Every structure is written in C-alpha cells, then in structure tokens.
Amino acid sequence: MKIAIDAMGGDFAPENIVKGVNLAKKELSDVTFQLYGDGAKIRQFLDDETAIEIIETTEVIDFHDDPVAAIKSKKDSSLVRAVTAVKKGEADAVLSAGSTGALLTAGLMLVKRIKQVSRPALMSTLPTADGRGFDMLDLGANTENTAHHLVDFAILGSYYAENVRGIEKPRVALISNGSEESKGSPTVKEAHEILSAMTEINFIGNIESRDLLSGGADVVVTDGFTGNAILKAIEGTATVLMKEIKSAIMAGSVTTKIGGALIKKPLSGLKDLMSTDGAGGAAFVGLKAPVVKAHGNSSELAIASALKQIHKMLESDVSGKLVKHFENMDK
C-alpha cells in the first residue's frame, strides 16, 4: 500500500513530518511512503530512503491562503500533488498537517465523496478517563447540518470505530442538552427518531457534553459548529488544567514542592492520557479514500500515529465497506 504525504504542510514541516515517517517505517513494513515537497529539505531528516518515494514539488499552500483559490492556483503544491496521487490511483490515502480548509477542499474536489453521503465529516479520536477514547464527528467540516446528515455521520462513525479501532458494536450517541429523548433541537430530535429505528448501529440515545470524557459513548455525533466548539473547549481545558496544577505546585511551600515531586509520575500519566499524540489525525470520513488531517503543530509521534491510523483504515478497507453500504441503502 502507498500513502501520499504532504511533507511541507504544518508548523514544523518538513522535520516533524519526515521524522514521523522514520518512526512509522519501523512498524509498517508493507507501506511505501510518498513524500511530496522539497527533496533537499526532506532528505535532511530521513534516516534512509528504503520504502520512500520523494516527489519534488515547487509550491506550498499556506494557512492564510484561500482554500478554493489555492487548490486551483497552486497545482504544484505538496498538498495538491499528494491528494491528486490518490485521485489518480497512484496512492491509496493521503496525510497532511497543512491547511485544514485546503485539505478538505482538495478531498472533495479530487478524491470525491461517496455518492450517497451528502456531507462528509471531520472525525477525530479524543481521550477519555478510561483510556478507550471516543470518536467525535463532525468537528468542523460543516457548520450547519440536517437530521439526515447526522444519521449519515452516525453510520460513518460506527463503521470507523468497529473496523479501524476494533470496537465491537460501538455505542453511538447524539450530543444534546439532556440525555432524555425529549431533549434537543428539532434537528437532534428528528435524528434521534431515525437512529432509534435503525438496527445496523448500536444507538444509545443522547449524551451531554459533560459525560464525554468519562467514556459514555464510543461514537459521538453532532453538527460541525458544535463539534468544533466542544473540541476547542476540551483542548483548552486540558492545557489550562495542566498549567494550573504546575503553577500551584511551584508557587507553594517546600512541602508542596516535595508533594509535587512525589506525584510527578501520576501527573505525567495524566498528561499522556489527555495528549492526542497517540490518537492519530482527524479523518475526513465520507470520501472514497482515506484523507487524514494531522494537527498543524504535530510532533513526530503524532505523525507516526496518524500513519498507523491510515494503515488500519486501508487494511480494514473501511472506505470500500462504506461505499458498498451506502450503495445498498440506495437500492
């Protein structure tokens, strides 16, 4: 299998991207890694060129570029060339830590959505206290969604959780302002009614945002605006929490500092639990092939995790299974 990688996308490209490939190569012996970008810069960080293809490109899409305009005008950019490789069948999947808007636009324009899926969604695996994590979608690919969009998201998320993360009968829930069936907006209530009648997924009803990190569901479905807001709140809370704990210890007495030293290992474990480095990237689900977005400031470990995530997606043929599923629904 071949994975196309935008080596020039991200805050720390190409260094962290290439070093992430070095890590992933040690575990993914059946993968050829296609690195799109400045060959000279890429080679500075490569351990060796085994299972590596370097494709020279002359342009880079910046975070401030208009996504649609950039896709059309910067056709020799590392991002566009990598996505185009998937379109042409020269690669099986694509990874980028570059512009989210540009990657989503390129995915829709070049890779194309599954015909019966009206709105693809951005989905990521987020941490929970029990270490299992949960998949949430949509995280911002769409700002407004209908009930039928949410139903599609539930199916997409359930298939991903089962086939890629190996969760048997994943519990699927809708974000709402209460767990009761009567709670929620008209859109959520309509989606709840449709999902409750479906037997192909394990729909458990509504879930409140306060229960997400305690592992109340394996797949959480919401509209893109709400999902993005929740994601940013989780990221911000985790950052502030760790910062405040450290500040409180450092500002305390000698006894407090000694206590802080004693709990350093458990705190490190908490930091690892809340870290998304091992979770992979955000998958743009609903497209005909895997398109995965890594965080702009991804570490080399996060890039390696995203590549392993893509490997699982390809190995399980989750995109192919989804295409067949939605085709059967259309009959």
Curated annotation (Swiss-Prot):
Its EC number is 2.3.1.274. This is Phosphate acyltransferase. It comes from Lactococcus lactis subsp. cremoris (strain MG1363). It holds the Pfam family FA_synthesis. It catalyses: a fatty acyl-[ACP] + phosphate = an acyl phosphate + holo-[ACP]. Pathway: Lipid metabolism; phospholipid metabolism. The keyword Signal does not apply. InterPro entries: FA_synthesis, Phospholipid_synth_PlsX-like. Keywords: Cytoplasm, Lipid biosynthesis, Lipid metabolism, Phospholipid biosynthesis, Phospholipid metabolism, Transferase. It is found in: Cytoplasm. PANTHER family: FATTY ACID/PHOSPHOLIPID SYNTHESIS PROTEIN PLSX, PHOSPHATE ACYLTRANSFERASE. Homodimer. Probably interacts with PlsY. SUPFAM superfamilies: Isocitrate/Isopropylmalate dehydrogenase-like.
